[in-house]
Regions:
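Cytoplasmic helix-loop-helix junction between adjacent transmembrane helices
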Residues: 1-25
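Multi-pass alpha-helical transporter architecture, strongest
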Residues: 62-65, 184-190, 273-306
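Juxtamembrane intracellular "pre-TM" segments in multi-pass secondary transporters
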Residues: 71-103, 128
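Extracytoplasmic gate region of multi-pass secondary transporters
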Residues: 99-153, 209-213, 217, 245-252
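Intracellular juxtamembrane helix-capping segments at the cytosolic ends
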Residues: 1-9, 211-224
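Cytoplasmic membrane-interface "Motif A"-like loop-to-helix N-cap segments
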Residues: 161-177
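Helix-loop-helix hairpin linking two adjacent transmembrane segments in secondary transporters
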Residues: 21-68
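A membrane-interface helix-boundary motif in multi-pass transporters
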Residues: 41-53, 169-172, 256-279
Length: 308
């Protein structure tokens, strides 16, 4: 689905389109928290899962009525049929010849370390910050909705504007926003729940999550040949989930259990701080990706690279 956006939108609007598409993430996260917070005490957690799954199935039915979009840069009359081995060869070539693409993907994976570890956020809220489960689910749900939607819209739109008006690509926009927001990501893990930095940190965390999607997914799509765009986007999503989230949630669980066994008073605080810092590896990677973007795109498409 994500790769279809490059066929429907020009390059100058691709970041906003990707950010708008990925508003589904904060909306979904917020909806799950709000349903758990408001309905969980009444209907139980199993019924909440069934309700959320049913909503997803109903929305998926609408895809049956969505028409296909002609592929840009691909001959619709004579579509090219690539063997799996050829696709892998082109994918490997695209990665090795484009530092911007490699750094964008690696930066996205690093950014997802904390998203995986954030699976323990609700335990942290309850066990180490003294919240009641339903109360914090409702509270964080509203913050997730507001921050996530704002971040997605701003990230896509401002990322597009950045690339149009500066000599660097959209990842450089993420470099600067990450530098600005990272101190808040650390600070709110250290303060008590009644400190203003606590709610602000949760809100800005979801803003930062929203800022990520538009610039990175549009960058990945612009740095690969159209004929394997869907494959590369799929590889990127696989990397984010299998490596980024996988390391975050598995490593986070191991570290939290270890800290608990050692008798540490706040094992989840330490765990989440460690993975917050690890996720900051994305910052220098986005800097390199932003600096290299235009040169790598020109190499891919030639000096007359289309920048619609």
């Amino acid at each position: 689905a994500m790769s279809m956006l490059a066929d429907r939108f020009p390059s100058r609007q691709l970041g906003f389109a990707a950010g708008f598409y990925y508003m589904g993430v904060p909306i979904g996260v917020a909806a799950s928290l709000l349903i758990a917070g408001y309905l969980g005490p009444a209907i139980g957690w199993r019924a909440c899962f069934y309700l959320l799954g049913g909503i997803g199935l109903l929305l998926a039915v609408g895809l049956l009525f969505l028409g296909e979009t002609p592929r840009k840069g691909v001959d619709a009359a004579q579509p090219e049929k690539l063997k799996f081995r050829e696709i892998i060869k082109i994918l490997r070539s695209s990665l090795t010849q484009s530092p911007a693409l490699m750094c964008t993907i690696a930066g996205g994976v690093a950014f997802h370390f904390i998203l995986g570890a954030a699976a323990f956020d609700q335990l942290w809220f309850v066990n180490e910050r003294g919240f009641e489960r339903a109360e914090i689910a409702r509270h964080s749900g509203w913050l997730a909705a507001a921050g996530g939607i704002l971040g997605n819209l701003l990230g896509g739109w401002l990322g597009d504007k950045w690339q149009q008006n500066f000599k660097t690509g959209r990842p450089m926009f993420l470099f600067w926003t990450s530098l600005l927001l990272s101190p808040f990501a650390v600070a709110y893990r250290l303060v008590p729940a009644d400190n203003i930095l606590f709610d602000l940190g949760i809100f800005l965390g979801f803003v930062q999550l929203g800022l990520f999607y538009g610039p990175t997914f549009s960058t990945v799509q612009e740095l690969v040949p159209p004929r394997i765009r869907a494959t590369v986007v799929a590889f990127y999503i696989l990397s984010l989930n299998l490596i980024g989230l996988g390391i975050g949630i598995t490593g986070g669980g191991i570290l939290a259990d270890y800290m608990t066994a050692q008798g540490h008073g706040e094992p989840y605080t330490v765990t989440l701080l460690v993975f917050t810092v690890l996720s900051m590896l994305a910052i220098p990677l986005m800097y390199v990706a932003g600096k290299r973007f235009h040169a790598d795109r020109a190499r891919l498409f030639g000096s007359g690279a289309p920048m619609e």
